[in-house]
Amino acid sequence: MSALEAIKYSRGKLEVLDQLRLPHEHHYDEVSTSEEAFDCIKAMRVRGAPAIAIVAALAASVELHNGSCTATGTEDVIKYIDSRLDYLYESRPTAVDLGNAVRLLKKTVRGVKTEGLTDAEAKEAIIKAFIEASEEILAKDLKTNKSIGAFGAKWLQEQYKITDDSKITVMTHCNTGSLATSGHGTALGIIRTLRDEGLLRHAYCTETRPYNQGSRLTAFELVHEGIPATLVTDSMAAALFRLRKAEENIAAVIVGADRVVRNGDTANKIGTYQLAVLAKHHGIKFMVAAPTTSIDVDTETGDDIEIEQRKREELTQISGAVVNADGSIDTSKSVRVAIADQRIGVWNPGFDVTPHEYIDAIVTEKGTVVKGEDGKFHFEDLMPERFQ
């Protein structure tokens, strides 16, 4: 596991790395209430679908562990927990992992056997089950990411028969590594595995405007891991593919997902769709890396995905550490500056939807799924229990 940790947890205490301060400053916020977790997620101090779900679940656990629930009867205790989970869900409704975690935890507390217990004993049993289920979400995520990395690298090896003389170059978008998960990562986890298996030549990461998760976070992770990498702006991808595909053996664009729906349409950070179109035009594989918890089999197509609109200031203003006259960086100072006329109108969707037609493979912890003869992705064999 990478030394980078977005989440530090022990029972009764949760700390979350403030990713808005990266790459210049490591600061952990203590998160002890649902309100603090909501603010942390909404402000994007933590981001990435798996990490969001983990933070929400663990924050509610810490809150319960520390005695926030004053209800006594079983029904009232469950009602209180439901209210906390419903509140946390609204922090990022696009992230299907969060919705899955909410449903799992609601089901967990309703499955606790309370017959013959006093109100106090029943309350203790319900809270204990909730906390243990939340902790299992954290533990399971790391195993999931390692498996995604292995399956993704295997699929690419099968496609390209990679040797020491034909190592591949890949591109990734946004941030899908240790900072977006409990560790290793999804799309960036595949890149890590490619590096570990001697299959990777180079990685490109996009800046990922307007919030710059690529330049602030992914570039930071790649440097930290010693992975050979280059940062490009989002608008450079087409030129890169045209001019350097053959020379650098650019083989794949690998992205994460906030939500994959039944037919394979994928919601991910804004800018993903354009990369998929460019990859298809240039004959480059386009891969989505996502845990099965991010697959929403109840939503038929991407047209039904709710897309969050972000605040206008993300496009018109930017924050960063101060660069001194000699070129050194003063990490003790952060300033916010305007980069556009503040009167300009702004359209700022946080995500876009990539149609399944542009996706070559969806990599999960259970295996890699490719399109069937009908041109759509089918997840029935991968997780039959979700189709009963």
From Swiss-Prot:
Keywords: Amino-acid biosynthesis, Cytoplasm, Isomerase, Methionine biosynthesis, Nucleus. GO terms for biological process: L-methionine salvage from methylthioadenosine. GO terms for cellular component: cytoplasm; nucleus. This is Methylthioribose-1-phosphate isomerase. The lineage of its organism: Eukaryota, Fungi, Dikarya, Ascomycota, Pezizomycotina. Catalyzes the interconversion of methylthioribose-1-phosphate (MTR-1-P) into methylthioribulose-1-phosphate (MTRu-1-P). InterPro entries: IF-2B-related, IF-M1Pi, IF_2B-like_C, Initiation_fac_2B_a/b/d, M1Pi_N, NagB/RpiA_transferase-like. It catalyses: 5-(methylsulfanyl)-alpha-D-ribose 1-phosphate = 5-(methylsulfanyl)-D-ribulose 1-phosphate. GO terms for molecular function: S-methyl-5-thioribose-1-phosphate isomerase activity. The gene is mri-1. Gene3D superfamilies: translation initiation factor eif-2b, domain 1, Translation initiation factor eif-2b, domain 2.
